[in-house]
C-alpha cells in the first residue's frame, strides 16, 4: 500500500506524506493511511509494511479515548457506507470516513520533555518558541509542565519553523490560538498520564486541528501515533541521554549516519531497519491498547 498501488472509485483530492484523501461529498472525505514513511520531510522509497493499519488503529483508539475533551473528525460512517465491498475490504483497517474541515494554519506541538528542535533552541537561547525554561536542563529532561510550542505549516518538502505564541496569534487570531493551546495541552496531559501507566512516555506530540462549518474547533488527521509523537519506553528512559523511541527513529538514526544530505532522493533503507521499525510500531499499539 504505497504511493501508486491503490485505485478507488472515489476521486483522490490530496496526497500527503503518509495519507491520501478522497472526496465523498461536500461534507465528508475518506482518509487512507499508506505505508509510506517520511523522514526529514522527504518521502522515502521504502514503505513500512502494515504501518498505515497500525497508525490508524492507534489514532482511532486516541480519538475515542479523548472524545470527551473536544469533538473530532469522525462522522460515524464506515468505509462500507461509502465504497463497494471489494474496495472497502482492502482498506478497512487503514481508512476513516471523516468530516471535511478547514485546517488551522499552524502545527500544534506540545512538549513534556526536552529533545529534538526544542533542545537545539534551548541550548542556543534558553527558550523554546520564546518560552523561558529553567537553567541546566539536559537532553530528555522532563519539563516542569507541558508547553505549547507551535510551528509554521510549510508545504511538503519544506521544514516547519518553530514560532512564538505571539506569532501564532498573528497567524490564526488570539481567540483561536488560546483555544488551540488549551485543548492541545489538555489532550497531551491526559494522554501522557494514561500512556505512563502502560510503560510509555510521550515526550512530545503534534496535533492537527480544523474548524467545522460552524467554526467549532475539531481534532483531526492523526492523534498521538509514533509518527506524530516521540514515544519512549519507561524502562530505557534516562535524562541526559537520547532515549530510543517507538517510531521511525531507527530510520532517522540510520539516515543521520549514512552521510545523506537530507535532500530528495533518500538512500535505500536496509530491510532489517525496516523490520525493526514495523516491530516498534506494533509494540506501541499493543502496549497502549491492551
Curated annotation (Swiss-Prot):
BP GO terms, sorted: 'de novo' IMP biosynthetic process
Reactions the enzyme catalyzes: 5-amino-1-(5-phospho-D-ribosyl)imidazole-4-carboxylate + L-aspartate + ATP = (2S)-2-[5-amino-1-(5-phospho-beta-D-ribosyl)imidazole-4-carboxamido]succinate + ADP + phosphate + 2 H(+)
Any Pfam family: SAICAR_synt
GO molecular function annotations of the record: ATP binding; phosphoribosylaminoimidazolesuccinocarboxamide synthase activity
Record bears the keyword Lipoprotein: no
Pathway assigned to this chain's UniProt record: Purine metabolism; IMP biosynthesis via de novo pathway; 5-amino-1-(5-phospho-D-ribosyl)imidazole-4-carboxamide from 5-amino-1-(5-phospho-D-ribosyl)imidazole-4-carboxylate: step 1/2
NCBIfam families assigned to the protein according to its UniProt record, in alphabetical order: PRK13961.1, purC
Name of the protein in its database record: Phosphoribosylaminoimidazole-succinocarboxamide synthase
Organism from which the protein derives: Haemophilus influenzae (strain PittEE)
